[in-house]
Amino acid sequence: SRKSNFIALKRGRYWRFGLRPPFINKKEVRKLKIKKFLYSQKVAPYVFVIPFILSFAIFWIYPLCSSVFMSFEKITPLETKFVALENYKKLLSDTVFLTAIKNSATYMFWTLVLLIPFPMLFAVLMDSNLVKAKGVWKAVLYMPALTSVVISGTLFRLMFTEYSTGQMNKLVMALGMEPFKWLKVGWTGMAALLVLACWRWTGVNMLYFLSGLKSIDTSLYEAAEIDGANGWQKFRYVTLPLLRPTTIYVLTISIYAGLAMFLESYMLWAGNNSPKNIGLTIVGYLYKRGIEKNDMGYACAVGMVLLVIALVINIVQLVCNGTFKREED
């Protein structure tokens, strides 16, 4: 034991002065050099980042590049043929695809109208002293987000059924009106989708805004009160400007979620075949062409158009919000 301690101490002294101990074999020297290299300040950060880079490249970069190349091909079970821009030319005259774009744009617009101001209002109420049992209300509003889309979509399909046994038609009949064919008419079908979206995501967006409100310094509100500001003025000139980063984030993810919506529509109409395509979205059309009709090249072209639309909308939104402007000195 004393001998091993002495050898270890002696080895440490040798390495401290950059000398090689004469009694260490080459294999041990190689291990020490590798260990020293990996634990150096220049290399260690990259070692920890490598797993993320590999996973990002495998699961994001490779599929994206593959989809770009596949969008210029006609892919069948028997052969793959390069067709250049043929898939994109077909998209321009595809009326079903244009209907899907219209449905996705309408859904995205109304989700922005409903799922930004109302969750912000709920967050302000939860942050004030006007509401009691705040924990209960937060749980009630957030619990729908924990429900599976498959289950919630099935429940809403039963609620909005065209028969008189549906909950929504019972409510309509109680008001003295005739039952609606909710999921067979364009505007009522979109209304059902929006009710499902608001039910699921109001609590999530409320928590985003609530976290933004918690980061605002309360001394700003106290200073506003001293200056004679009322509740609306404090909200207008203190809360809204300081909630801008949170609002931009919620707006960005809402745009993406609106364009990428698929499963809610799929479950609400029990498949991807809504009457006259009133519930067909861009991702739903991508699924129909790629999976149901086995036309992967055309489906990839649909996906590339969706990517471009999402990028353009987000860039325009960020430019309008002044995100890219440099701060003036």
Task: Tell me what each language-model feature is.
Residues 21-39:
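Short, Lys/Arg-rich, polar N-terminal cytosolic tail immediately upstream
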Residues 35-37, 41-329:
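A structural signal for multi-pass alpha-helical bundles of membrane permease subunits
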